[in-house]
């Protein structure tokens, strides 16, 4: 599980190339959703690590610590983007911790309803979720 989590974090971080907070947040959200839709079976495993604490708490302490450290890398990246946006006046939100967890929950749920045979492609859904994340921090939506 640790290797899968780290592969997810590395993949998402590699797609976040924007220097300004809004672009980076949009890239992070889109990459998160895209990865989960491209790897739905692994996304189910992540639900255990990111959401179901009771199962993670049953792991040996050394594994729990490594999983928490990997989760922290991802959350620190997201919180860093949120804090940078707040400092620059681009974002407006009440609490960085709650906002970060809300974005993680939002992006982490896309695989539960997505149908690859449906009328929306993965990139379409990823772009919409990037808009949702931008809206959560009261930032402008993308313009088409």
How does the language model describe each region?
Residues 44-47, 94, 144:
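Short, hydrophobic secondary-structure boundary micro-motifs
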Residues 30-35, 72-88, 104-144:
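C-terminal peripheral helix-coil segments that are non-catalytic and often amphipathic
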Residues 1-15, 23, 27-34, 38, ...:
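Alpha-helical structural segments
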Residues 38-62:
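Amphipathic alpha-helical segments used for helix-helix packing
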Residues 20-24, 98:
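A conserved beta-strand->loop->alpha-helix hinge within the catalytic CA
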